[in-house]
Amino acid sequence: MALSSWSPELGLGSEKALPVAAVSTGPSLELCTFPSTLGSSVATDALEQLLVVEQSLQSDYFKCNEEAKNFLKDVAIAVKKLEEMRKSTIDLLEIESMELSRLYFVLETLPTSVSRELEECVRDARRVNLVEMSELHTKITRINDEIEFLKKKILHLQTDNTALGERQEELAKHYGKIVLSVNHAMKEKATTTIYINETYTKINLEKKELELQKTYIQEIEEQIERERAEYLKKKEKLNQEIEEYKKLCELKRKETYAKKKELDKLRLTMTKMRETVTTSTVVLSDHNLELARLQESIREWEHKIEDMKKSCKILEDKMLFFKNNREKLDDSSNFEKSELLLKIKQMTEKLHNCRLENKALREKLHTVSRQYKIVLNEEDKVFMQKRKIYSENQKQLAFIAQKENFLSKRKVDIKNMEEGLITLGELHRATKEVYRKQIKILNENMERETQRCIITQWKIACLRKKHARWVKKIKDEIKELIDKIQEAENRRSELIEETSIREHDINEFLAKIEQLTLELKQEEDAFVIKERKLIQELSKFEQRFAEEAQISKEKEVELDKCLPQLQVAEEEFTDKNRKFQNLIETVTAQKNEQNLLNNNISQFTRDFIRYINNTKKVKQELKQLREHESYKTKAHFEILKSLENEIYLHDLKTDALILENKRLKEYIAYLKDNIEQYERGGEDLVRSSSDLSCQLTDLQTQYSDLWAEFWTTLKKRRKRVLLK
């Protein structure tokens, strides 16, 4: 008996002839030993190649699709499992060889009848082993073919990966350029918006400054009016004082005339006294006593006169103090007038400069608005170009994905065709049950595909309904957006009208301010002329008063020279009495004037306090009004900003909705194409199933014929064996 031994290269599908291992029943029993490196060289090479591929997959330089990576990883795992299976089969074969050697030893000790039966069993087992070996050989060849196909597929995927990597780099460069252009455009837009905001803030600040200047001008006008009123009051007081001084001068003239008359009378009395002196020498003693008494009374009167002089000096000092204060007040009023005039001039210059700056800023705003419109148009163009590029990129990616799916389907179809050819080659040796199972599987696949087609049609109908609802919703939202935009435009037009009305009011107010400044200048010129005239008149009156005082002094000197000592004493006594009376009258008049001045000062302080309080109230009200106006302007500006942002967001939403509508349309067209392809595939499958059923009937007849021949040959061989 001879049994074929296990070849070491059987598991790898080699085309060499299988060596025969002799199994003898004699004493020289050969053990079936197997080498430890059964098919290890090719397996190790494959594993090394797969390890290299795995390392390249794990590295960042290698670029490939995730499907290809997963496929290669699965292949590596399958090869590792095959290597483990190979080692396990080697171990099992060694165990079986040991058992066979033990059985051969047992066979030597058994009788001949039993050995024959065992030989027949071994023959049958050998035949079964040969059939299994042939099946394993076919499987190994199939695995080798699959490995070669996988290698080819790996090479093809590598080429695709390189092409896709280059395409990806090109797309990345193009995308980087687009991103840089977009960033540059956004940067320019940001700079323009910042410049516009700065100009807007400058305009607001200048408006606030103009309002402050207007308020200051109003305050200054009010101060000027008040100062005018005060000046008129002072002027009236001065006129009254001048009239009083004139009256005093007239009274003094009358007094001087009376004094002259008295002097004449005294001269007459002097002559009479000289005449009487001669007659009154006898009565000198009596007169001496009277003179002593008179001297004592004169001393007393001198003390009183000194006290009166002191009081007069005090009153004169007070008068000088009041005069100095009056001069200081006049100087301060003149200084304040000059300062106010300078301020008014500065304010007029500032107003002129502000107008020029306002004109320049308006021109800048006009240019900036033009630039902003140009930038917006450029941004719209760039955005449209981006959309076109993005749509083209998506179309290209979809086209590439479709091509990849088509290629994968074609590869799968080629695989299936190859497997079908192999199965057709093996169908000669297969049974009817296999054909029936395949037919059942095909029927089940057909039913599944029909069910899938029905499900896809149902999904398409649902999607159409959803799309119709979505279109209705979008139309309603677009209508609402149009209404909101119209409302925003109406608000914007109203705000523009309000701004135009306010600008008109501001221009009218500026014209009024200019008219008031001109009127103030004219009134100030007239006031200055009147002041000069009054000063000239006062200087004339002072000169007259000084001349009359000099004349009176000269006359008094002449009187002093003429009168003797006794008469001088009497005259001084009389003069001092009169002066005393005059001083009392002047003191009373000055006290009255002092009281009037105190009352006027108190009234002036009260008026000044009221003026300060009123100015504070006016300033507070102006601050409140400014804050209210600034708040209104800010609120209007924020409303405009929010409306612009809402319009921009609605534009973006509409663009996104349009893009989604386009994508849905493309996806629906893609689904329609897939449905048509599935329908065509179903028709092709029906045709192929009909062809396969015909081939199955033919092969079934061939198989029945071959099976009959096989049984006839078996029967003939059994008969021959029995005959032998």
From Swiss-Prot:
Q: Check the record and name the PANTHER family matching this protein.
A: COILED-COIL DOMAIN-CONTAINING PROTEIN 175
Q: Which organism is it from?
A: Bos taurus (Bovine)
Traced from the root, the source organism's taxonomic lineage reads: Eukaryota, Metazoa, Chordata, Craniata, Vertebrata
InterPro entries referenced in this protein's UniProt entry, alphabetically? CCDC175
Extract the coiled-coil ranges from the record. 131-164, 203-256, 282-373, 426-534, 565-627
- Segments traversing the membrane: none
Q: Mind telling me what this protein is named?
A: Coiled-coil domain-containing protein 175
Q: In which domain of life is the source organism classified?
A: Eukaryota
- List keywords of the entry alphabetically: Coiled coil
Q: Does the keyword Coiled coil apply?
A: yes
